[in-house]
Regions:
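Structural beta-alpha unit
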Residues: 1, 83-123, 144
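Small/aliphatic-rich secondary-structure junction motif
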Residues: 1-63
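Glycine-rich, Arg-bearing micro-motifs that act as flexible, cationic patches
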Residues: 2-3, 106, 123-148
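A structural signal for isolated positions on well-ordered beta-strands in alpha/beta enzyme cores
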Residues: 7, 34-36, 96, 123, ...
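Short, solvent-exposed amphipathic alpha-helices that sit
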Residues: 22, 73-85, 111
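Solvent-exposed polar/charged
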Residues: 28, 117, 148-151
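A short acidic, glycine-rich active-site loop
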Residues: 59-76
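Short, flexible loop segments at boundaries between secondary-structure elements
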Residues: 144-159
Length: 159
């Protein structure tokens, strides 16, 4: 039987918790399911992207600290997601986790789909109300954008 690999987009929302519980219910105790957790990281503030002259070293240090703080917070979200899936019955070996760096918010859904393809995921799973910060940036629903752009990939939107 063919393995099924799900890319689950996670954040700190209640929608993500419901999504993870649903995925655990569907995928637990099934040898042919693998789950790839993807946490979308927002891009650094613009003032950290542009380096100028003498400020260059100071801005690099500031950017490293910002990335470190963001990654620690996001790692906690991935750890919580992993815990929900494990409690739901998935084996540790069936779960992997990745960051998805969203350099340009207008291409965020494309970046998520690119990660799904690179990790060889058949399906992308997202909560209806997940990634609210991204919805504000793209002036729309990230789940709907994934459905619209996800040609060739199955998209599950969990209410």
């Amino acid at each position: 039987m063919k393995n099924t690999k799900l890319l689950v987009v996670v954040d700190e929302s209640r929608a993500t918790k419901r999504t993870l519980e649903y995925v655990a219910q569907v995928a637990s105790r099934r040898q042919d399911f693998r789950v790839c957790l993807a946490h979308a990281l927002p891009s650094p503030p613009p003032e950290q992207v542009e380096f100028r002259g003498a400020e260059k070293a100071r801005l690099r240090a500031y950017k490293r600290r910002w990335i470190s703080v963001v990654e620690m917070a996001e790692q906690r979200a991935l750890d919580r997601a992993n815990t929900i899936l494990r409690r739901g019955g998935l084996a540790a070996g069936a779960i992997e986790a990745h960051y998805c760096y969203l350099v340009d918010a207008t291409r965020a859904t494309q970046e998520i789909l690119r990660l799904a393809r690179s990790r060889k995921c058949d399906t992308v799973v997202i909560g209806r109300k997940s990634l609210s910060w991204l919805g504000e940036l793209i002036h729309g629903d990230p789940a709907e954008e994934l459905v619209r752009q996800g040609k060739g990939i199955t998209i599950w939107v969990v209410e």
